[in-house]
């Protein structure tokens, strides 16, 4: 009897050792996506109104046509050949992602982008419109005030200053879901897990960990991306099984670090552990100065002319001194960025340097531009 008890304790300790996470283990839910449970893209067209003279100009004909069609729906009839010239209106495209499992009445964020030649969408309001999927069906309704992160200022002579992108904005919770997208998650006999970052080692580790946790033949690695899992057929049991599955700790192996750059806002995010090989960096520095003044033209007293004011812009481009920076092998990228910042480089300059380092094979990381 004592031998049997000791044997049972041994199996219990062995099972605990197999389930306990290692130092580099991660929850399976953060490493994979479930096939069939995904977001779907939605798109729509509408008008943004209430702009302070920064809307589409007269040459954008479809904005006037859209405005006339909208007024006609409210019983306002315009003359047939009349082209409404409204500078406070801009034609826009609306895009959104419908997350998996979202039902009727839930809200999602939307992105509003100018189609015509509007200068800015700041302060505008999106009129009610339908958002459709790839099948042409309506899945959501969108409306709300546009939040713009960019700004554009323009002088009388045509010189202007633009910060970020003023013709693209967002509306948090700006769309209401009206139809749920069906999923085959409950109908398939197996559940397929797709690794977010494909790797043969990671796929094999996922299959081994699931077989240890739920029994042999529970999971099979099909490729570097897919892992097939046998799941219960009952809906409630399948949901409970998936909740346990997402918490299983997986040793995903070493993942390559990333450098992410947002081309719209100039934001640079550097992951931990990004290293650089030996290289030399030199980047030109251009400074553009625009000075604007108004000149007054006074006619002769007896000439019968009028006093006019003409704008004059003086644009000066200054090229700064190029400085070569030597980068020793094994240097962390964070130290390089700090050095580049000390030279007065902007985020766009930093991104240009990172792209050059990546193309030269000196950047040991994955470069992602969003």
UniProtKB/Swiss-Prot annotation:
Keywords: Bacterial flagellum, Periplasm, Signal
Protein's GO biological process: bacterial-type flagellum-dependent cell motility
Signal sequence extent: 1-25
UniProt keyword annotation of GTP-binding present: no
Cell location: Periplasm; Bacterial flagellum basal body
Main location: periplasm
Residue stretches spanning the membrane: none
GO molecular function: structural molecule activity
Any one GO CC term of the record: bacterial-type flagellum basal body, distal rod, P ring
Origin: domain of life: Bacteria
Subunit: The basal body constitutes a major portion of the flagellar organelle and consists of four rings (L,P,S, and M) mounted on a central rod.
Family from the record: Belongs to the FlgI family.
NCBIfam families linked to this entry: PRK05303.1
The protein's role, per its UniProt record: Assembles around the rod to form the L-ring and probably protects the motor/basal body from shearing forces during rotation.
Name of the protein this chain belongs to: Flagellar P-ring protein 1
Natural source organism: Yersinia pestis
Lineage: Bacteria, Pseudomonadati, Pseudomonadota, Gammaproteobacteria, Enterobacterales
Gene transcribed to yield this protein: flgI1
């Amino acid at each position: 009897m004592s031998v049997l008890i000791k044997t049972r304790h041994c199996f219990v300790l062995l099972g605990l050792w197999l389930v306990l996470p290692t130092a580099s283990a991660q929850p399976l839910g953060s490493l994979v996506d479930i096939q069939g449970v995904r977001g779907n893209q939605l798109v729509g067209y509408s008008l943004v109104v209430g702009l302070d003279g920064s809307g589409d100009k007269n040459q954008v004909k479809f904005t006037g046509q859209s405005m006339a069609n909208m007024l006609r729906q409210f019983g306002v009839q315009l003359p047939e050949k009349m082209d409404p010239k409204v500078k406070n209106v801009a034609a826009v495209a609306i895009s959104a992602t419908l997350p998996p499992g979202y039902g009727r009445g839930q809200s999602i964020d939307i992105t509003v982008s100018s189609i015509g030649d509007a200068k800015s969408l700041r302060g505008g309001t999106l009129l009610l419109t339908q958002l459709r999927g790839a099948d042409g069906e309506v899945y959501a309704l969108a409306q709300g005030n546009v939040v713009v992160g960019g700004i554009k200022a323009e002088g009388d002579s045509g010189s202007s200053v633009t910060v970020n992108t003023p013709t693209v904005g967002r509306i948090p919770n700006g769309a209401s879901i009206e139809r749920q997208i069906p999923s085959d998650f409950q109908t398939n006999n197996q559940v397929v897990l797709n690794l977010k970052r494909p790797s043969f080692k990671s796929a094999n580790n996922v299959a081994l960990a699931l077989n240890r946790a739920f029994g042999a033949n529970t999971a099979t690695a099909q490729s570097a991306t897919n892992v097939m899992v046998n799941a219960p057929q009952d809906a409630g049991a399948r949901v409970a099984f998936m909740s346990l599955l997402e918490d299983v700790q997986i040793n995903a192996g070493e993942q390559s670090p990333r450098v992410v750059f947002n081309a719209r806002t100039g934001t640079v995010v550097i992951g931990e552990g990004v290293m650089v090989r030996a290289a030399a960096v030199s980047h030109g520095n251009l400074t553009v100065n625009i000075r604007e003044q108004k000149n007054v033209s006074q006619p002769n007293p007896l000439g019968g002319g009028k006093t006019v004011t003409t704008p004059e812009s003086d644009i000066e481009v200054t090229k700064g001194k190029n400085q070569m920076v030597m980068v020793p092998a094994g240097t962390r990228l964070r130290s390089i960025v700090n050095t580049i910042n000390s030279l007065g480089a902007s985020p766009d300059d930093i991104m240009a340097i990172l792209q050059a380092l990546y193309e030269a094979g000196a950047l040991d990381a994955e470069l992602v531009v969003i």
